[in-house]
Structure formats: structure tokens, C-alpha cells
Amino acid sequence: MNNIIKMLNEEQMKKDVPEFGAGDTVVVKVRVVEGGKERLQAFEGVVIAKRNRGVHSAFTVRKISNGEGVERAFQTHSPIISDIEVKRRGRVRRAKLYYLRERSGKSARIREKLSTK
């Protein structure tokens, strides 16, 4: 029984999900259906939380739109998500960046992680 569940979960998981974590700036391209048309909508922001649970993995992205903070939670392996692109790697010391909700301006900045080649 356990093996069957594992097989079904692995079948439904996406293979092309990039490696990212809290503090990274990502662009999530979401399929949106308006009327009869389907289009891609980009949501760019900072990952403030990530939950790794296999098929049930999720992450939360926060951005500032017109001076107002907007957060959106995405299921990592959802068919609604067409692409996840990592724009910038952030260097943070926490797994969950909920403290950014109270911050604005310069205090909400995240240091950039320098890549080692």
C-alpha cells in the first residue's frame, strides 16, 4: 500500500522545479483563464517561506505592489504553475522571513548571496 502511494506521488511531482529557498527573488509564471483565453501571469517577489512535503510542497512569495504588500502562496507541483525562474539569490539566516511583513524600505532589503564557482 505504501509503495503505491509513493509511486503515485512521484508520478505527480514536476521534474523541472529549480532549486530555491527563503530570501531568493523568483518570478512565478501562473496560467490564468479569462473567459475562453488562457494566458501567463508573472508574479515576481521574495520567497518568505518554503514547505517541503513531496507532492504537497508549497512556497509563499511576497512583493510590494503600489505601496501595498501582496503575498501569494503557491503549490510547487501544481499544474497551474508553468515556470519558476530564480532572479536573485538572497543570503538570510532564517527559514521563514515573516518579519519582512512589518518592515518596509531599506530595512526590508536582503543581502545577495555571492555564487562560488
UniProtKB/Swiss-Prot annotation:
Kindly list the GO CC terms recorded for this protein.
cytosolic large ribosomal subunit
A single GO BP: translation
- Swiss-Prot/TrEMBL keywords: Ribonucleoprotein, Ribosomal protein
- State a single Gene Ontology molecular function: structural constituent of ribosome
List the NCBIfam families hit by this protein, alphabetically.
rplS_bact
Q: What does the function comment of this entry state?
A: This protein is located at the 30S-50S ribosomal subunit interface and may play a role in the structure and function of the aminoacyl-tRNA binding site.
HAMAP family membership: Ribosomal_bL19
- Which family does the similarity line name? Belongs to the bacterial ribosomal protein bL19 family.
Name of this chain's protein: Large ribosomal subunit protein bL19
Its lineage reads: Bacteria, Pseudomonadati, Pseudomonadota, Gammaproteobacteria, Alteromonadales
